[in-house]
Amino acid sequence: WWYGHNAVGFFLTAGFLGMMYYFVPKQAGRPVYSYRLSIVHFWALIAIYMWAGPHHLHYTALPDWAQSLGMVFSLILLAPSWGGAINGVLTLSGVWHKLRTDPILKFLIVSLSFYMMSTFEGPMMSIKTVNSLSHYTDWTIGHVHAGALGWVAMITIGSVYAMLPKLLGREQMFSVKAIDTHFWLHTLGVVFYIASMWIAGVMQGLMWRATNADGTL
């Protein structure tokens, strides 16, 4: 998991944050809210992410000190994660009205909402008492897909929609209405999917707690 969580942290976070820092200001027509914050939270992610992996190994043969260290670093990770997300959202200061008419901007900003949700949920699930309920359940699957389908997929789709007209020499995409429909279908689909996983996961965890050591209720 030292490798596994770095894969999540760098393949599915750092690169897509770079996309966010390019396409959100471009689409909003505004400068990044804070360049200093972008640099600070980037290096904080680099420094902290590698020690978050042990939170996947709570209540296993991993030494208890390593499990606790993974939990602490996961909780610290909340600060740089939300720092980047808030920096992206506040880039819209003064142009919030564009969200009503620009579905590409909706994709980009709602992806940040999913990023904030999954980067809050991850540290929360790393707490040992919470993890004793969530571990090995569908809750974890819901958490991963909030990041994969909510953050990674939506920032990618928004970026592609923003980039294609420029590559093809057009003023805008063929149908803005179709992009808006795509946005709502995707958002509702992800919400229903991850909510069902959360509910199923909590029920699984509670049922396991209801059994005795020999597996009987």
Describe the residue ranges of each PLM region.
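Hydrophobic cores of alpha-helical transmembrane segments in multi-pass integral membrane proteins
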Residues: 3-27, 36-57, 69-92, 105-128, ...
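Flexible, glycine/threonine-enriched loop-and-boundary segments that flank and lead into catalytic domains
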Residues: 131-140
